[in-house]
Amino acid sequence: MKYENRYEKLQFFESFIANIITDLKKAAPRFELGIKDLQSSALPLGHAADIEMIQSHNDPTSSASHSVLIICNGHGEDVIALEIIKRFLKKIKIKKVEVMPLVGNGKIFDCIKSKNFSKIGYLKELPSGGFSNQSLKGFLLDFFAGFLVDTFKNFLIVRGKSKDNYKIIAVGDLLPLFFAWISKCEFSFVGMPKSDHTWSNGPGWALSDFYHKFKGSEWDPWEIFLMRSPRCKSLIMRDEITANNLNKKKISAKYFGNPMMDFVDTKNENISNIIMFNRLILIIGSRFPEALNNLDIFLKCLEDVKISNDLIILLPLSINANVFTIKRHLSNNGYLEENNVNFLVGEDSVWKNKDKYILLGKSTFNQWANMACVGLSNAGTATEQITGLGIPSISIPGAGPQFTKSFAKRQSRLLGGSVLVCDNKKTLIDNLEVLLNREDYILKQVKIGMKRMGKRGASKKIVDHINLNLLT
């Protein structure tokens, strides 16, 4: 059998896979439910409680012809998906909007109160925190927790959407992209996790650079194959270099800016209350107990830091953080709670150890991010955001499962060296003292990080592009 062009080949291959799935589907019931009562969370640091309850301005009885399913597979991706959903519900006529978070239970979406919105799928917190690909241990923990079974059930849900005239928006990397491709629906793909900055221009190098250079993109051949589907109506990348490299492969990828920068405040309305202090933001991550290990590492390092002024340490906590446990760790490291001291920047409590003050606040990341001079950060999304605000940061990798040495080095390369990765306590202290005392060095790092992360305003452009190319 001969095919006139590559699109016919793709359609034949998709039809072949679809027939296999149909056979599998006959052997299993169709699963679909809206999850309303799951309450635990592992959201990106500081985002969830800052989001107001969102009411729909969309008329469910309008003549909208499409329903939309958004599939996302990461905590940062959940935040991007939330912004897309908010804009859809307020501006665009759609029958129904559904979201399927593939990592965690998607509690961040509970702030949306609309009759034509729902969370669907089999949602649960994974033992690895969603990083089963980082280690064999993480994969095995997720496997025995039922990850593969739940993924297959979610897969069957997605396969049932084509007959209901759904459009799909995949946010993430391979898994949501594959789900969108196998659905038989037309789809858009927002590929945020991968960037060609990680292999093309340093700092440093890794063995994987040769592999990516050979491919010409950090996106793998099987992912590029899925992107070439005639049902893929728009591709959006996190930065210009990644989009351009895909364009060289005759793939029409667009770059509108990084939507991660749309979710942090750029104003410092209360910073005057702490402007006379050296200011440090401590980002320990949102996955426990890893976050507690990160906190202990940072507190041990801060014991020996020598600076001229008193130090304000901003410690924003994620919505799922156990504040009592955090306070116990502060106490174990020599900090005492100061009930009569207030800095009036939204803190829940103040802790002191000699010339260092720690301000503790739940869901205050958005409010505090732009108040710091330097960050100590063992996290993913939040580190990228403070870098985009022009704040250099330092990391010291731990045991994981998320923030391992390889993760930290990749992140540093992604952000052009704006995150300094340290191997030990002494190196971290030396780098921190330099950053707190040398303004010229900070300015150099600021320019690199801000350029890599891009400007605000990408979310609106992304939604407009998807609406034009997928929904009309």
PLM segments and residue spans:
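Nucleotide-activated sugar donor-binding and catalytic core shared by glycosyltransferases
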Residues: 2-25, 29, 34-38, 50-472
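Histidine-centered active-site/metal-ligand motif
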Residues: 47
